């Protein structure tokens, strides 16, 4: 996913719906993030969602609920080619995430021969090729993580970073307000530092204008909104037009 020439554009999947995932893939998004951190998506759901996404040409990213080797192993065994790990704050945690994603000798991922990722055992070289065919993306979501950005990025096997404006604004005392000047300054600082070390970094924003500004700064890939945010926005637009009611003020700033 990270080798595309133009900045890949994605969105968040919060609905646990394979049909929605498939539709958004056909809509033209380059990648779709399945959020298992904030949504009660089970691994059986993930199985069907990945099948739906991979029919469309979009790339799946699975954000697991925690930096846990079992959760990462199951997402990879189900066939996700990209995983995102939340709340990584230092090099030790980064090494743990990479280890869980990679087979020995690079890591400690448990091996099974027959699962969806190996095409149920028909991909004879899967075990040898898997370490090069999956991406490990680590989330930078706190001031501590930002302070340790270079040491996190320097861990072998880290393919990209992803800045989380929502949690960053929350832990820095500006909950629900990633547009605060202090947070925007951190966002700008992160891309400058990532450019300096050659590490791709992504980000999420709630509007095309905001996402466009991030891409202009040099963010390598970005997500805009989410399936649920898009549905609520369109529903409100239709109800305002047809019923003349005042649309409720949106509280979500990204997804």
Curated annotation (Swiss-Prot):
Induction of its expression: Is highly up-regulated during growth on sulfoquinovose, compared to growth on glucose or succinate (at protein level).
Enzyme class: lyase
Site annotation Transition state stabilizer: residues: 63
Keywords tagged on the record: Lyase, Metal-binding
Active site positions: 38 (proton acceptor)
Cofactor note: Binds 1 divalent metal cation per subunit.
Protein family: Belongs to the HpcH/HpaI aldolase family.
Protein name: 2-dehydro-3,6-dideoxy-6-sulfogluconate aldolase
Species per Swiss-Prot/TrEMBL record: Pseudomonas putida (Arthrobacter siderocapsulatus)
């Amino acid at each position: 996913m990270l080798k595309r020439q133009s900045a890949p554009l994605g969105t968040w999947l919060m609905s646990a719906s394979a049909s929605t995932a498939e539709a958004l893939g056909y809509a033209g998004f380059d990648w779709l993030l399945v959020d298992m951190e904030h949504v009660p998506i089970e691994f059986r759901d993930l199985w069907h969602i990945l099948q739906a996404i991979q029919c469309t040409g979009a790339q799946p990213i699975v954000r697991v609920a925690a930096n846990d080797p079992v959760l990462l192993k199951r997402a990879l065994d189900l066939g996700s080619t990209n995983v995102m790990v939340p709340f990584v704050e230092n090099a030790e945690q980064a090494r743990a995430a990479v280890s869980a994603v990679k087979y020995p000798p690079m890591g400690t991922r448990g091996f099974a021969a027959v699962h969806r990722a190996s095409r149920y055992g028909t991909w004879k070289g899967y075990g040898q090729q898997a370490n090069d065919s999956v991406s490990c993306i680590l989330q930078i979501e706190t001031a501590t993580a930002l302070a340790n950005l270079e040491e996190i990025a320097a861990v072998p096997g880290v393919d990209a970073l992803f800045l989380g404006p929502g949690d960053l604004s929350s832990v820095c005392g500006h909950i629900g307000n990633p547009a605060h000047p202090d947070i925007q300054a951190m966002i700008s600082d992160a891309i400058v530092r990532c450019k300096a070390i050659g590490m791709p970094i992504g980000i999420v924003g709630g509007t095309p204008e905001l996402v466009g500004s991030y891409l202009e700064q040099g963010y390598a890939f970005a997500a805009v909104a989410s399936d649920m945010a898009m549905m609520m926005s369109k529903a409100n637009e239709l109800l305002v037009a047809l019923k003349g009611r005042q649309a409720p003020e949106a509280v979500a700033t990204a997804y």
